[in-house]
């Protein structure tokens, strides 16, 4: 909703976590003609899930240049909306290059990097790009998302990749934080009934 996706838009989503996947399935009913989503090698299962959620094309940024892919896939038109939920400063910089003039960039991922802003500003101004921050969804957006899920019977439960018992809450938090080798949850849940 924050990106203002409308009929026929080309949308790029940077980051295939639960926010990125949610943006993917929300973009189709909003009217997006093409939906692109990026990730890295370890995101392969998430990128496959993104295809089920409506992504037209997935992009492994360790193997392909996102700007080149977007130029090719849009016949040089570039994107109307880019949503960055990766929090990766390099992805944010690439995002601007994937947008055409007078388009919209939504930032929903925190970087902690104070050096990105000065580098972006001139491109945003010259290309008249609207910059929209997004920290959380409002009530209207949440209600709309729930309606979409209910009406389309969308398989959002497939985002849940790990379920932990209550007595493993610390392990769950470490897994989410990337501290457990070989464990890379898309969405993790705690089920107190498991122990």
Regions found by a protein language model. Name each.
Residues 33, 78, 154-158:
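A local structural motif
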Residues 3-5, 74, 86, 99-100:
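A generic alpha-to-beta junction signature in SAM-dependent methyltransferases
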Residues 1-64, 68:
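Mid-domain Rossmann-like dinucleotide-binding core that forms the NAD(H)/NADP(H) cofactor-binding site
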Residues 45, 51, 56, 89-152, ...:
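Glycine-rich phosphate-binding loop and adjacent beta-alpha segment
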Residues 80-83:
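N-terminal Rossmann-like NAD(P) cofactor-binding module of classical short-chain dehydrogenase/reductase
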Residues 22, 64-65, 72, 93-97, ...:
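C-terminal hydrophobic helical "lid"/dimerization subdomain
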């Amino acid at each position: 909703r924050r990106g203002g996706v409308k009929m026929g838009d080309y949308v790029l989503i940077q980051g295939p976590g639960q926010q990125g996947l949610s943006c993917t399935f929300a973009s189709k009913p909003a009217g997006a003609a093409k939906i692109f989503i990026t990730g890295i090698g370890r995101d392969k299962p998430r990128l496959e899930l993104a295809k089920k959620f409506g992504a037209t094309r997935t992009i492994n940024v360790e193997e392909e240049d996102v700007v080149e892919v977007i130029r090719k896939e849009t016949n040089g038109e570039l994107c109307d909306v880019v949503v960055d939920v990766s929090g990766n400063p390099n992805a944010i910089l690439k995002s601007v290059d994937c947008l055409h003039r007078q388009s919209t960039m939504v930032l929903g991922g925190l970087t902690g990097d104070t050096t990105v802003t000065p580098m972006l500003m001139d491109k945003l101004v010259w290309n008249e790009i609207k910059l929209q921050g997004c920290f959380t969804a409002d009530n209207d957006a949440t209600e709309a998302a729930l309606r979409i899920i209910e009406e389309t019977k969308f398989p959002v439960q497939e985002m849940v990749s790990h379920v932990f018992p209550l007595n493993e809450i610390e392990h769950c938090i470490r897994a989410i934080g990337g501290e457990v080798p070989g464990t890379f949850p898309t969405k993790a849940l705690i089920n107190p009934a498991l122990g």
